[in-house]
Amino acid sequence: MARILIVDDDRDLLDGQQAFLESKGYEVQTAAGMDEGLAKLSGFEPDLILADLMMEHYDTGFVFCKKVRELPGLKNVPILMQTAAPKEIGFTLDSHSEKARGWMKVDEVLTKPVPLEDLLGKIEQYLSR
């Protein structure tokens, strides 16, 4: 089954999504921040990455995604960004345009909380490409 890396500073979210995705047969690794996430990538090659936007700083997710895209072999790995920014600061991120996806270095932005079945649907959508 596919391998997924989840990078988020919310331990409850990490644990919940990991348990759910593992119950669906996915191999899941988690990281509690950007540095830990980048370190995990040295020994774990995910088929998809779920990354939070606001971790250590408001833009940490963007920095993480940019660094991932610079790593050999990970340029085309789907990255789904999860964020509560629309609810927390009223800032909406639209990943529907090619230009927006280009500067964000993500394939799609999902607004937290993401219902687990919806998350599974998105994961399956991107992994089937």
Where are these regions (language model features)?
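Conserved acidic carboxylate
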Residues: 8
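Two-component/phosphorelay signaling modules centered on CheY-like receiver
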Residues: 11-29, 126
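Acidic, metal-coordinating helix/loop segments flanking the phosphotransfer/catalytic sites
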Residues: 30-48
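Short amphipathic alpha-helix used as the core "switch/output" element in two-component signaling
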Residues: 39, 62-75, 98
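His-Asp phosphorelay/catalytic-motif detector in bacterial-type signaling
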Residues: 45-47, 73-78
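Active-site residues of response regulator receiver
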Residues: 52-53, 83
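Alpha4 helix (beta4-alpha4-beta5 surface) of REC/receiver domains from two-component response regulators
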Residues: 59-63, 85-110, 117, 121
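Receiver (REC) domain switch/output surface
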Residues: 115-129
